[in-house]
């Protein structure tokens, strides 16, 4: 079986420090912002949780604050925990407190999950409503569609991977990784708490123009090595993109990748 990574011209860049990775992520994001704002007047960005938000802090530096057209950004989440939006486990809260509240992106351009579903812990309804939200924005031409498939195509997704090789809330051994019809699905038995989550499906993730997967620390090294050794039991091994899928790794995360890969 040919590697998905080979098919998509996936790249990996290994950075000596997290600081250098963060700086490179900021530059990469800012360059794509300039490209898409000029070409189409919008920049659709998909966030994940975890350490990613702290690495985005480089975009708070004056050179980016002053040059980025923040009013043209539209923010989404590749996955979300179905908890109240002010809960400590909320990816929305993490992103808002650490990044979104510090940049002038219009609040109307930020798309968290439905607050009532979040408060009630209703994962199924939260997934359905988020999918409806995406479809409305496709109809308004804020989100593009991928070629003939009709799936939404985001400009940039900033992703992370767990030590078990999960990305978004697509976990090894769970059926959600095989979902191909829906844009957004849900899980109520996540192996990582909290158990209720919604997540983009794999086709939506892989339709993005640019996917940047940022992974740091030795705890992730085994999973990173398996991904680059084409172990498709790991959801992250299926990552691709329309234009570019790129992995930003620190030295610890990359330490077990077989030579030549």
From Swiss-Prot:
Its EC number is 3.1.1.31. GO terms for molecular function: 6-phosphogluconolactonase activity. Coiled coil: none annotated. InterPro entries: 6-phosphogluconolactonase_DevB, Glc/Gal-6P_isomerase, NagB/RpiA_transferase-like, PGLS. Keywords: Cytoplasm, Hydrolase. It is found in: Cytoplasm, Cytosol. The keyword Ribonucleoprotein does not apply. Belongs to the glucosamine/galactosamine-6-phosphate isomerase family. 6-phosphogluconolactonase subfamily. This is Probable 6-phosphogluconolactonase 4. The gene is PGL4.
């Amino acid at each position: 079986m040919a590697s998905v990574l080979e098919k998509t011209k996936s790249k990996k860049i290994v950075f000596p420090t997290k600081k250098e990775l963060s700086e490179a992520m900021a530059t990469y994001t800012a360059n794509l912002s300039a490209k898409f704002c000029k070409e189409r007047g919008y920049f659709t960005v998909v966030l994940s949780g975890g350490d990613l938000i702290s690495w985005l802090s480089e975009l708070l530096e004056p050179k980016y604050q002053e040059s980025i057209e923040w009013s043209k950004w539209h923010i989404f989440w590749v996955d979300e925990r179905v908890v109240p939006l002010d809960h400590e486990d909320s990816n929305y809260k993490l992103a808002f407190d650490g990044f979104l509240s510090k940049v002038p992106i219009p609040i109307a351009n930020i798309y968290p999950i439905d607050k009532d579903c979040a408060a009630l812990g209703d994962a199924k309804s939260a997934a359905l409503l988020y999918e409806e939200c995406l479809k409305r924005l496709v109809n308004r031409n804020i989100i593009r569609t991928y070629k003939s498939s009709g799936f939404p195509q985001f400009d940039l997704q900033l992703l992370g991977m767990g030590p078990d090789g999960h990305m978004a809330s697509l976990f090894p051994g769970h059926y959600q990784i095989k979902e191909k019809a829906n844009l957004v699905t849900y899980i109520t038995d996540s192996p990582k708490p909290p158990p209720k989550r919604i997540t983009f499906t794999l086709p939506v993730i892989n339709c993005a123009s640019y996917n940047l997967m940022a992974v740091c620390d030795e705890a992730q090294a085994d999973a990173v090595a398996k991904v680059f050794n084409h172990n498709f039991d790991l959801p992250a091994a299926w990552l691709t993109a329309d234009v570019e899928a790129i992995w930003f790794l620190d030295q610890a995360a990359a330490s077990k990748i077989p030579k030549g890969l």
